[in-house]
Curated annotation (Swiss-Prot):
GO terms for molecular function: ferrous iron transmembrane transporter activity; GTP binding. GTP 1 binds at residues 8-15. This is Fe(2+) transporter FeoB. It comes from Legionella pneumophila (strain Paris). The gene is feoB. GTP 2 binds at residues 33-37.
Amino acid sequence: MTHALLIGNPNCGKTTLFNALTNANQRVGNWPGVTVEKKTGEFLLGEHLIEITDLPGVYSLVANAEGISQDEQIAAQSVIDLEYDCIINVIDACHLERHLYLTSQLFELGKPVVVALNMMDIAEHRGISIDTEKLESLLGCSVIPIQAHKNIGIPALQQSLLHCSQKIKPLKLSLSVAAQQILNDLENQLISKGYKNSFAYYFSRRLAEGDTLIGEKAFTESLLIKLQETEQNLDVLLADARYQKIHEIVTLVQKKHSDASEHFTAKLDKLVLHRFLALPIFFAMMYLMFLFAINIGGAFQDFFDISTETIFVQGSGWLLQQLHAPNWVIALVANGVGKGINTTITFIPVIAAMFFFLSLLETSGYMARAAFVVDKAMRAMGLPGKSFVPMIVGFGCNVPAIMAARTLDSERDRLLTVMMSPFMSCSARLAIYAVFVAAFFPSGGHNVVFSLYLIGILMAVFTGYILRKTTLKGHASPLILELPAYHRPSLRRLLRETSLRLRFFVYRAGKLIIPICVILGGLNAITWGGGISSGEANTDSLLSIIGQWITPLFAPMGIHQDNWPATVGLLTGMLAKEVVVGTLNSLYAQVGHVGEIAAAHFDFWGGIKAAFGSIPANLSELGSALWNPVSASAADSELSQSVYGIMSRRFDGAVGAYAYLLFVLLYIPCVSTMAVIRQEANKRFMWTSIVWSFVVAYTTSVVFYQGAKFLDHPQQSMIWILAMSLSLLFVLAVFRYSQYGMGRQNAAANT
């Protein structure tokens, strides 16, 4: 077996190459001692097994104690600690000179290296030609030109891994005699300490460049003190010598003609990064994303809803009825398992459209610019602009958004981002928004969704600001981020990335929704006395009693006693937001006897025909749906219309529905998010996030509802608004004067 490390700069196409090499044979875990994700994969070449470990993207192998992210520490440490046979160094052919800096450091390890020269087609399009044979001769290692996104050059790269036993000699750098002598002395001291010759050579260069995390701390610190006494600028001299050598190589192997794409990127950036137009363009892009998800995705929602409703809910109910099964069994299977499957599959098109648009923004190069656009506004409040990149990831799911915070250099910035990310509207919340928009907002539904996303962003910024003034005081680190050139992503790549994200989401949602729906069906069938109900609408069931007992707590935000299913939806939503829609569908259907009607009038072929007929009907109305997105999102089946009708009667109109959505937006996303906060920060931050999110959600929802209903009962509304305002001020005071000192605690101490 051959074990290869995959390493390269950020945005070099490393992950695309990893996917091309390993396909579905991948494993995801964590690096030892930290929560940074570790990706490994393997593939067979004949009878030879090759294992690939994907290291985090880095610009350099120098690891300092401060000013470096966990990802960079992992990459720098892995090339030393892991057992491997060779290194695959992925280089962006469009930025050869910049990427060869990391290559020059890898050569100093003395390990076999294969250079994968990626994005050759893009380089040619930009007028860049590279003599790969000459580059191979000058570097002394295999150089394989590839196009990872098109699978071009992958077989040649795979073959090169079978013949990568030749060790690489470091590049000869032009250093002064004094500087070279210092490096030799460092190397000899390391050898005398027991280091192997190859590692001693590598460590001496890292120490000279200011690496403080290698070797034994006491020994390396003593060497660094001596180094500073003899030559304080050795790190600068080394970097300069590297760039001189790299420039010589690039001059010999690369020819660059006029670059039309660079001119295009520069011209487009003048507009996208314009001082006054940048923010409006950013909000316009976000707005287009919601329009696309609600309308284009919603056009296919009826097909999934009607077809799965016909097969899994009505079909299973009819079949069990023919078998003379008890009503509680029909309710458990049809409105439990069947409704769970129906709910999971129904919101696939909206979520898929969301993921597709996010992938388009990321691969086109705009997402990196979004961080720069919001950087100035966020830094004015002392918040890191770079944190907005993980927060945008939160539009898909809060869990990877929080995990992406590990790429931030500052511990303070990382913790701020971890605490801010849960307020970003994830795709699971979008499924809830789509249902309520269809039921309560017959026009301008996309504006409602946009407002919720905007409120989530503002609340995240507000949370960061409060933490900056209390437990996480300090200054935001400067934003240093590479702006990639604009790309025209292929449809195949977009569909593949969308498919990977969607598959993970549906699997995660389905394994939660279906069991929850079964449990809810069971609780709704079991009475308080322990008996089994024979009907579907049972006000004496355990579920009904629990919901009715808790519902008065939510009365100030417009949830009345008869709307207890909405309360149960909030409770199950703490497990996962994907479950809320399934909970509401299941409970409202049971309360309204919808399942009985569906079973009595079951028409399989009629349902399938209606499902397929909904696609052209919705697509033909797409133009008007851009102004009225509900027409693309609402379900046309009798069952869906019945559920929407029950919902519209139970909630206090559009005001009550919007107050409910505000609570859904702001309270904890799911237990998975809380667990990740526990891992990425610590237990104290997790509980702080839980308490803060509930306080903010309850206060915002109550203040909105009471403010909207102020004319109906001014005295009552005024009391509630004042009470909520005072409660929020009290919580802020606790944050301000807290003696816990969360920001001083080691975030890795998970005790």
